[in-house]
Each structure stands twice: as C-alpha cells, then as structure tokens.
C-alpha cells in the first residue's frame, strides 16, 4: 500500500471498524481527508497536561548497612545478610556484594506481574538498598520485618550529623510503599493480611511485610536449616508462651507461622492504637494549656500528674518535685518555658 504513513501502534484497519464508521471513512477517503487505510482511534478530550516539574526522586542513591554497634545476625539470617553485603577487611567499609535488582527471578516473573521492561535505575538502587534492611530486621521465627513501611522509609533515608532525616533527601513513604507492593506481586514478600482502620485518626494502622520462601531462595540460604531455625525460634517465642498461659495451646503443642504472624500483628496494632490515643490526648491537653498563663500551666499539669501517680509515690512526693515533673512534662508537650527547670 503506497502512501501509507507511520501511525500509532493502536491504529486499526478500516475493515475492522463498525459499519457506520466504515461509511464515514470512505467519505473522508474520497474527499482526500484520509491518506491511509489505518485509522487511529479518537482520543479522549482531557485537560490533563504534562507538567514541567521534575519527577526524579529526592534520594536517587539510597544505601543502608548494619551499624557496628549492632550484634551480628546468627544462622541463615546472617548468611543471607553476608551474601548481600561485604566488608573490606582493611578499611572496614561495607558495600553491596549482590544486587538483588539484577536477580534472574525478576526477569522470569516480569510478565507475570504486568511489567514489560526491567527496573529503572533509581528503582534498582532503592531495591538494592532495601533488602539488607529487610533481612537485618527480620524476625527469626515469623520472618516478619519488625518495622512498618513508614519506619523503613525513615531508616533508609539519609540523615544529618544529629541523626535526623534530611527532608530534601528523604526516601518518601509513598515511593517505598509502591516498591514493596510490587515485591508482593512478585511473591518475594508478603504483607500483613488485615489492615485495621483507625476511626479516630481516619487512617489505617501501620502495615508490615515478611519475607516469603521465594525471597529466601533468592538470597541463597539453606531452606532446610532456615526452617529448622524458624521452628526452634517459634517454640521459644514469647507469643507461644503467652498462648500457653491463656490456655489456647498446650505445653506439647507448637504454634504455626501464620498464627504467630497474626498474633504479632495484632499486638503491634494494639500498641499503635494506644500510642495514637496517648498522642491525641496530649495534643488536646497542650491546646488547652497553651491558652493559660505559665503559672497556671504548671499548676494544672501538677494536678494532672498528682492524679496519675501511684498512691505510695504520691504520698511522699513533695510540691517542689511535683513542680519539676510538671515543667518537664510541659517541655515534652512543647509548651515551653524558656528558663531551665529548677534544680
């Protein structure tokens, strides 16, 4: 067909059109408005336009290694971490030994998760950096990473000399959440089955991930030894002892990995709810106290603390000591007294 021009990949031949559209096509062809037998579909009218803002991430090259003060990982968890990270015997500098983003597993399962191409360079670097964190904080019994997605993003973000995250270079929670969700689709990570809804704060409770057998196989660990160490840790776990005390399990019964994970996540959810309630109550108390004079703030806080003290401690607590406690509590509420507390 001479005179055909390059068209979009989703163009169709005129014979595949509906009868009414075929008649309209031949009318345009005879009038000279159509120069090809391939017809592009009509685009939807939209006001969306490509912005001029930068789409590159804040932290383009994240990295994380276990600090020297951390104890060395034992068993197959330590073997997995050592396969990921190597340490220079002379300088003591740590670097990546294996880049997980280049593992053949991701190439084999690429189409299964809906990907056509390999990871982009910035995603590769984030994926390489997050795996040492996942292995380092993974529980030996449940293989659950003991940090929420928000805490993981904070852990992997660059920090200043005081240990605070640099806002301009942070790894955002949304970016890491998208990466972990894709790893769940690959099957190398699992995610907590239930995400409870916090009605008061109108947001969900933290989510946690755990490393699946496919993920451990990618790391090259001995699966038999890993399973033995996992069962041993579960038998010694506090969760199993708690279930035995509650009468749910007998002394000779073992707890399953799924039940241990579910129980662990329930405890974390309850802790998060308790912490949020305490934070909300402290915020309301601070908003009420900041409208009062400084002396009244100290008096109100002292009375509040007096009611919360145990009876024996409240009996021997002097007014000066209670005042110091009140000033310290006000400082924690950031209601602030410029002068240091009395000694």
Swiss-Prot record:
Gene Ontology MF term list: DNA binding
Protein purpose: Binds specifically to the motif 5'-AANCYGCAA-3' (repA box) in the origin of replication. Acts preferentially in cis; binding to the repA boxes is sequential, with the boxes closest to the DnaA binding site being occupied first. It is involved in promoting open complex formation by unwinding the oriB at sequence 5'-TCTTAA-3'.
Single GO BP term: DNA replication
Annotated region (Disordered), positions in chain: 42-61
InterPro entries: Plasmid_replication_init_RepA (IPR003446)
Gene that produces this protein: repA
Signal peptide: none
Name by which UniProt lists this protein: Replication initiation protein
Keywords on record: DNA replication, DNA-binding, Plasmid
Organism the protein comes from: Escherichia coli
